[in-house]
Amino acid sequence: SGLWNMVCLPFDLSSAQVRKYFEEVKALESVELAGEDCNLNFGNVRDMVAGVPYLVKVAQTVSVQTYEKVTIDADAVSSGATVVSDGAVTARLQGTFQKVVPYGDNVYAYEPNVFSKAETGTEIKAFRGYLELEGVFPKRLNLYIDGEQTGVRLVKGADEDAKVNVYTTD
């Protein structure tokens, strides 16, 4: 509760059902490259479409969520991606209905409130999503929800083992 999480459902939800199960739901709307930063922009949605990954926030944490009056869409299993581009970078938010280990140099897993670079062998849980970027290897991946920046996770790169100054407060 209170955190953004990723979900990809195998059935549609109407706006009334969305309001019943989730406090807020956001979809990937655009991507932009700004220097060494890659900005992902998410905005409001009313209905949820089967096979599309969304950021969701629940009002309260539950261990099991039961959906009523829904129909599984078998065709959604093979689709399930949102693709946006600004010309310099293309972002593909891929949904999955089973555990997967995505392959590629520019794959990002979602943790509550942030995307972070997926290490080789990272497993993505069922009914979630992961991000693939083409055209750029950003230093930072910034997540914007309704125009406001959320958590920032530095992307591991060539400077990962560089010497840095560390300061303490004592």
Residue ranges and their predicted role:
Residues 23-32, 149-170:
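C-terminal outer-membrane/trafficking sorting elements
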Residues 36, 72-74, 85, 145, ...:
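Intrinsic disorder/low-complexity signal
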Residues 1-21, 41-151:
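A short, polar beta-strand/turn micro-motif
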Residues 34-42:
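Short linear interaction motifs
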